């Protein structure tokens, strides 16, 4: 009896093999051009070019010695805020990447109280022979979270309770910054091979752009499923204790036919 084996589309190992086969491109081919130091320099370059702001390393108390801190200066060199980076994993630290604030912007006694913002990630640490090298996805993630950081840093409201925005706007600044990450003019400024100092070749840039929609069918379905699950949960009319996993499985798989290879995102 011939059996067919289903492959989970989420398996990044095999997804990379397919991408390499279809586009002559894989993650490891790109990593040498995306050292963490260069990518950080790239987001600083872009922010300066777009908004005129600059970033100056400062010595301040850190909650972990691996963190970094920068003073953010406006085009006229006035103080906008402080930006912390916490790049590497450690025991007890949450996974993934996010941006948040330690202090929101507000006015106190007529004086602007600047925000203190943090970007947190879990990138691979540098080794004895190489700096921390990011994947293209991690590079776009850092640009994305930096967009959130800029949103916090640019706040200028009298009352911090009025600094929030509508939920459907929250991701706009981050999406804008994320899309800059692979623009050829921006790549030319920061995507430099950590050993040869060669700027990323145009041929590789074309491959990045040609493969930009690779595996997006899965990604889109995953996000739509998450949105549907969220709406289902918030449509419950009788508020009684329930099993979220069983509820989600029933809503997505039994009622909507979500294939098992796409697991619930959250």
Which role does the model predict for each range below?
Residues 125, 133-153, 174:
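Active-site recognition of the HExxH zinc-binding catalytic motif
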Residues 10-35, 180:
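Short His/Asp/Glu-rich catalytic/ion-coordination signatures at enzyme active sites or charged loops
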Residues 30, 36, 205-266:
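Pan-zinc metallopeptidase signature
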Residues 54-67:
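Long, charged, glycine-rich C-terminal linkers/tails
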Residues 1-9:
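Single conserved hydrophobic/aromatic residue that forms the stacking wall/gate
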Residues 63-64, 71-140, 257-265:
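Active-site-adjacent "gating/activation" loops or surface patches in catalytic cores
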Residues 73, 79-82, 155-231:
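Acidic/histidine-rich catalytic neighborhood
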Residues 35-54:
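Zn2+-dependent metallopeptidase catalytic core
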């Amino acid at each position: 009896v011939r059996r067919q084996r289903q492959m989970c589309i989420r398996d990044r190992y095999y997804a990379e093999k397919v991408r390499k086969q279809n586009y002559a491109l894989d993650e490891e081919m790109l990593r040498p051009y995306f050292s963490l130091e260069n990518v950080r320099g790239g987001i600083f370059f872009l922010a300066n070019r777009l908004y005129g702001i600059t970033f100056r390393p400062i010595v301040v108390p850190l909650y972990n010695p691996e963190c970094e801190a920068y003073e953010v200066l406006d085009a006229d060199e006035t103080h906008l805020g402080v930006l912390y980076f916490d790049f590497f994993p450690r025991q007890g630290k949450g996974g993934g990447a996010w941006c948040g604030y330690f202090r929101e912007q507000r006015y106190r006694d007529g004086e602007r109280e600047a925000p203190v913002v943090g970007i947190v990630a879990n990138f691979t640490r540098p080794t004895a022979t190489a700096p921390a090298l990011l994947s293209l996805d991690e590079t776009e993630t850092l640009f994305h979270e930096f967009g959130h950081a800029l949103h916090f840093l640019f706040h200028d409201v009298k009352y911090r309770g009025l600094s929030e925005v509508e939920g459907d706007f929250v991701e706009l600044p981050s999406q804008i910054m994320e899309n800059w990450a692979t623009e050829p003019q921006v790549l030319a400024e920061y995507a430099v091979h950590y050993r040869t100092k060669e700027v990323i070749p145009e041929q590789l840039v074309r491959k990045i752009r040609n493969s930009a929609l690779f595996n997006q069918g899965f990604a889109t379905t995953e996000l739509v499923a998450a949105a549907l699950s969220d709406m289902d949960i918030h449509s419950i009319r009788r508020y009684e204790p329930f099993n979220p996993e069983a509820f989600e499985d029933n809503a997505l798989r039994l009622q909507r036919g979500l294939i098992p290879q796409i697991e619930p995102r959250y």
